[in-house]
């Protein structure tokens, strides 16, 4: 099915954003895990996987419209060093995505591609949920301070008795 070139470009632009977010969130999850913020790392890793699902849906839609998914470009990956910087960087990605998705929905509806608009609306709902989470975490950091906040995202685990060195 031949799709509109402008719609396909919006789909590809959002695909680029999702591929970038996958990398950024996955790296942040690894940094968080390395720093011992294991509960936070699990959440961030899950967000990376959510972005992967978005990329899959966008890829399928682009292919259905006889377009070529562009996996060769990425936007700038913003890497935070502190938890606050990570949340701020991730918030920027989400704000940009929300703006792009809203613009895309308008174009898709104007071109009568309701299915692509529905795909963007579903992704938009997920991104709005994620930005709400990020803003809540940033508010908590502002109220509690970064050190106290971090004490809430550490998960103490017991050593695995069947781990290395066991028989």
Swiss-Prot record:
Its cofactor is heme b. PROSITE patterns: BACTERIOFERRITIN, FERRITIN_LIKE. GO terms for biological process: intracellular iron ion homeostasis; iron ion transport. Residues 1-145 form the Ferritin-like diiron domain. InterPro entries: Bacterioferritin, Ferritin-like, Ferritin-like_diiron, Ferritin-like_SF, Ferritin_DPS_dom. Pfam families: Ferritin. GO terms for cellular component: cytosol. Heme b binds at residue 52. Binds 1 heme b (iron(II)-protoporphyrin IX) group per dimer. Fe cation 2 binds at residues 51, 94, 127, 130. Keywords: Heme, Iron, Iron storage, Metal-binding, Oxidoreductase. Its EC number is 1.16.3.1. It catalyses: 4 Fe(2+) + O2 + 4 H(+) = 4 Fe(3+) + 2 H2O; Fe(2+)(in) = Fe(2+)(out). Fe cation 1 binds at residues 18, 51, 54, 127. The keyword Metal-binding applies. Belongs to the bacterioferritin family. Iron-storage protein, whose ferroxidase center binds Fe(2+), oxidizes it using dioxygen to Fe(3+), and participates in the subsequent Fe(3+) oxide mineral core formation within the central cavity of the BFR protein shell. Homooligomer of 24 subunits, arranged as 12 dimers, that are packed together to form an approximately spherical molecule with a central cavity, in which large amounts of iron can be deposited. PANTHER family: BACTERIOFERRITIN. This is Bacterioferritin. It comes from Streptomyces coelicolor (strain ATCC BAA-471 / A3(2) / M145).
């Amino acid at each position: 099915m031949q799709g509109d070139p402008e719609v396909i470009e919006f789909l590809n632009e959002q695909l680029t954003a999702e591929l970038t977010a996958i990398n950024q969130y996955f790296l942040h999850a690894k940094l968080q895990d390395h720093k011992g913020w294991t509960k936070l790392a699990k959440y961030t890793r899950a967000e990376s996987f959510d972005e992967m699902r978005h990329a899959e849906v966008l890829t399928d839609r682009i292919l259905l419209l006889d377009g070529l998914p562009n996996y060769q470009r990425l936007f700038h990956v913003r890497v935070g060093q502190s938890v606050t910087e990570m949340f701020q960087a991730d918030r920027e990605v989400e704000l940009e995505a929300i703006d792009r998705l809203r613009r895309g929905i308008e174009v898709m509806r104007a071109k009568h591609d309701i299915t692509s608009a529905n795909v963007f609306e579903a992704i938009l709902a997920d991104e709005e949920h994620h930005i709400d989470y990020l803003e809540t975490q940033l508010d908590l950091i502002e109220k509690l301070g970064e050190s106290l906040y971090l004490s809430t995202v550490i998960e103490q685990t017991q050593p695995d008795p069947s781990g290395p060195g066991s028989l």
